[in-house]
Regions:
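Preference for long, well-ordered alpha-helical segments
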Residues: 106, 110, 123-134, 226-243
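Loop-centered beta-sheet repeat module
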Residues: 120-161
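Asp-box/WD-like beta-propeller blade repeats and closely related beta-sheet repeat scaffolds
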Residues: 77-109
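Aromatic-lined, polymer-binding surfaces characteristic
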Residues: 20, 24, 60-71, 99-104, ...
Length: 252
C-alpha cells in the first residue's frame, strides 16, 4: 500500500519539543518502519524528536520510546541522563494507588524499558504487579471492559502490549501476569460492539498485531478479525489509519 503520504507527513511535522498523541504515533511508526526497512529517514526522525525533547527540557515518561531508541542507536549520554532524570522524578517503585489507563500507558512501559535496559531488572515485579492491580481495580465485569469504556480499554491494552514486548519472557512469572491481563482486555474489546474510530481502533489493532508477533495469540484466529476491522476503517474514510495498520499487519 501507499505510504508516501506518511513520509510527507513527517516532512511537514518536524519535532518541536512538544509531545502529543500525534508525535507518539509518528515515533512508534518510525521505529517499526526502521526495523522493517532499515531506512535512515525513519531513524533520523525519532532521534530528532529525542533531541528536541532534551533541548526543550520537555522529556516525559510517555516519550520514553524516543529516548530509549536514540540511546540504543547512538549511545549518547544526553539521552541516558534524560531517562535517569525522569526515573528520579517518578521514583523507582510504582505508586500503590490505582493508575488510570492513560497513566498506565505513559508510565509503565517506560518503567519496564528502564528496568530491562538500565535498571538491572530490579523492579520488573512491581511493574508487572501494577498492571495486575490496576486491572482488577478498573475492570468492569458487567461490560467486559476497563472502566471508562472502549477507549480506556484500548489505551490499557496498548500499554500492556508495549510492556510485555519489553519484558524478557525468561522472567516468566511477571511476563505471564501481564499476558493474562492482555488476553482478557483484548477479548473484551473485540466483543464490545461500537462504531470504529481511528484512535480506538488504531490502539486495539496495534496491540493485536503485537500479540500475534509475540505469539501471545493465534494468528489464524485474530489476523482475519484485524483485517475486517481495518477494512471497516477504510470504508469509514480513515484511509491513512488503514494504510498504517495494513503495513503493520503485513509485516507479521
Amino acid at each position: 500500500m501507499n505510504m508516501a503520504w506518511f513520509r510527507e507527513y513527517l516532512d511537514a511535522h518536524q519535532p518541536d519539543g512538544a509531545w502529543s498523541l500525534q508525535a507518539d504515533w509518528a515515533v512508534r511508526t518510525c521505529i517499526r518502519l526502521h526495523a522493517q526497512t532499515g531506512e535512515d529517514a525513519y531513524k533520523a526522525h525519532v532521534i530528532a524528536w529525542a533531541d528536541s525533547l532534551v533541548a526543550a527540557d520537555a522529556c516525559c515518561p510517555e516519550c520514553g520510546k524516543a529516548l530509549f531508541f536514540a540511546l540504543a542507536q547512538t549511545g549518547e549520554d544526553k539521552y541516558r541522563d534524560a531517562i535517569e532524570t525522569m526515573m528520579a522524578r517518578l521514583g523507582r517503585t510504582p505508586s500503590e494507588a490505582t493508575l488510570p489507563a492513560e497513566t498506565l500507558y505513559a508510565e509503565l512501559p517506560f518503567r519496564m524499558a528502564y528496568e530491562m535496559q538500565l535498571g538491572k531488572m530490579e523492579k520488573v515485579g512491581p511493574c508487572a504487579g501494577k498492571f495486575r492491580q490496576s486491572f482488577h481495580a478498573l475492570w468492569d465485569e458487567e461490560r467486559g471492559l476497563i472502566s471508562g469504556g472502549r477507549y480506556q480499554s484500548a489505551v490499557a491494552l496498548l500499554a500492556l502490549a508495549d510492556a510485555i514486548d519489553l519484558c524478557a519472557d525468561q522472567l516468566y512469572e511477571h511476563w505471564r501476569a501481564m499476558v493474562d491481563v492482555y488476553r482478557v482486555v483484548l477479548r473484551g474489546l473485540l466483543a464490545a460492539e461500537a462504531p470504529e474510530n481511528p484512535e480506538t481502533a488504531g490502539m486495539l489493532l496495534t496491540a493485536l498485531h503485537a500479540g500475534v508477533r509475540m505469539r501471545l495469540i493465534d494468528p489464524e484466529r485474530y489476523l482475519p478479525v484485524a483485517a475486517k476491522r481495518i477494512a471497516a476503517l477504510r470504508s469509514a474514510g480513515f484511509a491513512h489509519a488503514a494504510d498504517m495498520l495494513d503495513a503493520e499487519g503485513g509485516a507479521l
